[in-house]
Amino acid sequence: MASKRINKELRDLQRDPPVSCSAGPTGDDMFQWQATIMGPADSPFAGGVFLVTIHFPPDYPFKPPKVAFRTKVYHPNINSNGSICLDILKEQWSPALTVSKVLLSICSLLTDPNPDDPLVPEIAHIYKTDRVKYESTAQSWTQKYAMG
């Protein structure tokens, strides 16, 4: 079941990729993918290229994929291990969701962080109290880790 669904999602992604994202298997293992997310133009991550790993569980799509950033990113909902705090990857997951929708949700999370459900409380605090400092730090991390 899972491999048929994953193959279908891969075909759909190749035919109609989400804006500023790409994804596919890293090798022969259909359950291990790598994705690339371009930093959204209207965010401090603009110009950055962020690598993300996607690991599908054997019971996909009834369980969500494990998605993690491999590129360091300064964000209240993404920690230093690359874990992402995003409701659709946890309790709001639904089998109707796809990798494409997950990648688009991550893109919108980059543009609009959720400081009220942070994975990194210090960054959430800076985001809420000193937006200029947050944006300049996020930009400098993007230049340091996600460009070139």
Swiss-Prot record:
<dbReference type="InterPro" id="IPR016135">
    <property type="entry name" value="UBQ-conjugating_enzyme/RWD"/>
</dbReference>
<dbReference type="InterPro" id="IPR000608">
    <property type="entry name" value="UBQ-conjugat_E2_core"/>
</dbReference>
<dbReference type="Pfam" id="PF00179">
    <property type="entry name" value="UQ_con"/>
</dbReference>
<comment type="subunit">
    <text>Interacts with RGLG3 and RGLG4.</text>
</comment>
<keyword id="KW-0833">Ubl conjugation pathway</keyword>
<dbReference type="InterPro" id="IPR023313">
    <property type="entry name" value="UBQ-conjugating_AS"/>
</dbReference>
<protein>
    <recommendedName>
        <fullName>Ubiquitin-conjugating enzyme E2 30</fullName>
        <ecNumber>2.3.2.23</ecNumber>
    </recommendedName>
</protein>
<comment type="similarity">
    <text>Belongs to the ubiquitin-conjugating enzyme family.</text>
</comment>
<keyword id="KW-0808">Transferase</keyword>
<dbReference type="GO" id="GO:0016567">
    <property type="term" value="P:protein ubiquitination"/>
</dbReference>
<feature type="domain" description="UBC core">
    <location>
        <begin position="1"/>
        <end position="147"/>
    </location>
</feature>
<feature type="active site" description="Glycyl thioester intermediate">
    <location>
        <position position="85"/>
    </location>
</feature>
<dbReference type="GO" id="GO:0005524">
    <property type="term" value="F:ATP binding"/>
</dbReference>
<keyword id="KW-0067">ATP-binding</keyword>
<comment type="function">
    <text>Accepts the ubiquitin from the E1 complex and catalyzes its covalent attachment to other proteins.</text>
</comment>
<dbReference type="GO" id="GO:0006511">
    <property type="term" value="P:ubiquitin-dependent protein catabolic process"/>
</dbReference>
<comment type="pathway">
    <text>Protein modification; protein ubiquitination.</text>
</comment>
<dbReference type="GO" id="GO:0061631">
    <property type="term" value="F:ubiquitin conjugating enzyme activity"/>
</dbReference>
<keyword id="KW-0547">Nucleotide-binding</keyword>
<dbReference type="GO" id="GO:0004842">
    <property type="term" value="F:ubiquitin-protein transferase activity"/>
</dbReference>
